[in-house]
Design a protein with these regions (language model features):
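The feature marks non-catalytic terminal segments
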Residues: 49-63, 75-82, 130-208
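Active-site beta-strand->loop->alpha-helix modules in alpha/beta enzyme cores, enriched
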Residues: 1-134
Length: 208
């Protein structure tokens, strides 16, 4: 079983080679998906959208979900404030109800792409130590040039295992997920082409 520990309701797009199988999966989203200044309407839209996408595309892949960030009112961009023992123990309690013998945690790696992705990595590493399970980290979009707003996509600085996957199935689900996250179109306007290109032509690696 794999437990996906993700900051945002669309981060799964970067982990699809780990997701597209019949293995049992649990997704834990650590933020509510909107900024601290967002209104109730924006939060409702984002939450409804995320639930619709999950029901339509991920449930059929033997997946369950816990909207942890929504339940605990954790805004996007501020997950680092919840990197503490209390949060880790709360999440560990949920994960501990699963079969730990064959369990892996999958998350985004610490690479400076987004502070929430980095916080997810820190939380997952601590969970891995506490639960004594393997943690797999995946690159999202690390900064390319330090002085310019530019990013690589899914190119970890250190490569771990390469992962075999069906390019056609991953590409199709990528497009469906991006289309489903309507409130995130501005974000994906800059990332979609690079993400599709990476899945179409590159070897997919997890990150150390």
């Amino acid at each position: 079983m794999k437990v996906f520990i993700l900051a945002h309701q669309d981060d799964e797009v970067f982990l699809l080679p780990h997701i597209l199988n019949s293995e049992k999966k649990l997704f834990i989203y650590l933020t509510n998906g909107v900024s601290v200044n967002a209104g109730n309407r924006e939060l409702r839209l984002r939450s409804l959208e995320a639930k619709e996408v999950f029901e339509k595309h991920l449930v059929r892949l033997n997946s369950e979900v816990i909207w942890w960030g929504l339940e605990h009112s954790i805004p996007e961009g501020e997950l680092y404030k919840f990197v503490n023992q209390e949060s880790i123990l709360q999440i560990a309690k949920v994960i501990g109800e699963q079969d730990l013998k064959s369990l892996q945690l999958v998350t985004t790696t610490f690479e400076g792409a987004h502070q929430d992705h980095d916080a997810s990595a820190v939380i997952s590493r601590e969970l891995g130590k506490f639960l004594r399970v393997e943690v797999i980290e995946v690159s999202t979009y690390p900064q390319w040039f330090s002085k310019f707003y530019s990013f690589k996509v899914m190119k970890p600085q250190q490569l771990d295992k390469s992962i075999e996957f069906s390019r056609s199935k991953v590409l199709l689900l990528t497009l469906k997920l991006i289309k489903g996250y309507r409130t995130q179109r501005l974000t994906w306007l800059g990332l979609a082409t690079a993400t599709v290109t990476a899945y179409a032509f590159r070897t997919y690696h997890s990150a150390k």
